[in-house]
A protein has these predicted regions:
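Histidine-acidic metal/acid-base catalytic patches
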Residues: 1-149
Length: 149
């Protein structure tokens, strides 16, 4: 993500930005929320591909969003909200064994539930202070209080 942001700086055009793929961030060993924060803070987040995977280098599992890393998915969605992302969300999953319509419906429900949970976290008011203090237990207890989907 850092190298892609440098490219955005070099191109220096208002219509040149990035699409983040959660699964690709995971496979590259990145925290997807950190990547979203880096790109969002610079106003260069133009698209988001939502999926999940087991983070093996070179693998693109394309699993349902939040199915393997639910807390990372919640953190990612909360970061999108923090930076007022209002662009497109794409589900980049590969339903090889599943009914594709059923998987798509699940992805929509899961994304909506995570979005609502992130809104509750942000509305509670202490999320930014807890993360600034690096209070992991405080964040986990906050998630517990507002309800993890």
């Amino acid at each position: 993500t850092g190298a892609a942001l440098l490219l955005c700086d070099d191109v220096d055009r208002p219509n040149f930005g990035l699409t983040l793929d959660v699964g690709h961030c995971l496979a590259a060993g990145e925290n997807p929320a950190q990547s979203a924060a880096m790109v969002g803070a610079r106003g260069k987040l133009f698209g988001v591909q939502l999926n999940d995977g087991y983070t093996r280098l070179g693998a693109e599992d394309g699993l349902a969003f939040g199915s393997v890393h639910p807390l990372l998915a919640l953190e990612f969605v909360a970061t999108l909200q923090k930076y007022n992302y209002d662009g497109h969300l794409y589900f980049d999953t590969f339903p090889r064994n599943e009914d594709p319509v059923r998987e798509c419906e699940y992805n929509i429900r899961r994304c909506e539930a995570l979005w609502a949970a992130a809104e509750r976290l942000r509305a509670e008011g202490s999320l930014d202070a807890l993360t600034a203090r690096q209070d992991a237990m405080g964040v986990l207890e906050l998630i517990e209080r507002v309800g993890m989907p």
